[in-house]
Amino acid sequence: MQITIRDIINHLSQIIHDCSASGNKTGYFAALYKRMTAAVLENITAGNFEDADRMERLDIVFAQRYLKAYSAYFSNNPCSHSWRNVFDASKDHSLIVLQHLILGINTHINLDLAIAAAEVAPGDAIHALRNDFYKINSLISSLIDDIQECLSEVWLPMRILTKIANGHQIPVLNFSID
């Protein structure tokens, strides 16, 4: 059976539910990732990419890398050292929500994205991915305000940080994306 982006979103919803029920901090990244994945699906459906089929494949391959790491770790099977560090950190109650998010974001982008892109567009085909790749980066960047608002609802210090930063946080938050 072919997996779809909707299947990915459903799987992320299950992770969020399980993490919420168990108090596992890994759910913060899963919730953020679900929001981003839904936005990518909306843009694929709207025809906002040069090659919608390729972007759907990229999104699925990219997401599966996270889902496989999550499943392996929580089934006591090996996963990459990078993901293991993220999941181990979810047990550290001294970390703030933002730190859990950044750990997940950096690991997923810095480890999984290049591998997924090379798998979907091997060799010289990678160059054809460029424009759509930048469109996804812009899409994710455009979600920053929405994400900050959602984060403020679950983590009250975010409200204060947002007011203090007064927009200066955007380049920092986009660091791994750009």
Question: Which stretches of residues belong to each language-model region?
Answer:
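Short terminal alpha-helical segments
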Residues: 1-22, 109-110, 114, 141-144
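Non-transmembrane, amphipathic alpha-helical segments
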Residues: 4, 20-28, 47-50, 54, ...
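N-terminal ordered "arm"
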Residues: 6-44
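Detector for Asparagine
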Residues: 10, 24, 43, 48, ...
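Long acidic/polar interaction regions in large eukaryotic complex-forming proteins
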Residues: 34, 38-125
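A contiguous, surface-oriented mixed alpha/beta subdomain in the mid-to-C-terminal portion of proteins
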Residues: 95-178
